UniProtKB/Swiss-Prot annotation:
Family under the similarity heading: Belongs to the UPF0412 family.
Signal peptide as annotated in the record: 1-23
Keywords: Signal
Pfam families: DUF2541
HAMAP family hit by this protein: UPF0412 (MF_01372)
Keyword Repressor applies: no
Protein name, per record: UPF0412 protein YaaI
Length: 134
């Protein structure tokens, strides 16, 4: 009887751990070095077809000013969407989730994300980390 309870408890614990691990499906899509001068063609290419429903941005090193961002989907018509990003991100700060409306059933793959912006208040280039959630 005791071994049955031990096995049951082990199975329940394993299921609980696997559901927690599955709930946090965030991946670092990449890091972009932000130049000191305003640049509008900073591109993060996604080499593998990846369905991304939303992203977060983190200023890893230095402060960042953003003037825009767009996401491009892997489709025959090269569809894109402008993203509503904050105008500034301080070093160490992470934005809230920014939704990507890929389509009704969220099946289109993201091929690249472009940013316009630059480093502020630093002589070094800031780093913009892009985190995706599928």
């Amino acid at each position: 009887m005791r071994s049955v309870l031990t096995i049951s408890a082990s199975l329940l614990f394993g299921l609980a751990l696997s559901s927690v691990a599955h709930a946090n499906d965030h991946k670092i899509l990449g890091v972009i070095a932000m130049p000191r001068n305003e640049t509008n063609d900073l591109t993060l290419k996604i080499p593998v077809c990846r369905i991304v429903k939303r992203i977060q941005l983190t200023a890893d090193h230095g402060d960042i000013e953003l003037s825009g961002a767009s996401v491009y989907f892997k489709t025959a018509r090269s569809a894109s969407q402008s993203l509503n990003v904050p105008s500034s991100i301080k070093e160490g700060q992470t934005t809230g989730w920014i939704n990507i409306n890929s389509d009704n059933d969220n099946k289109r793959c993201v091929s690249k994300i472009t940013f316009s912006g630059h480093t502020v208040n630093s002589s070094d280039m800031a780093r913009l980390k892009v985190i995706g959630d599928d």
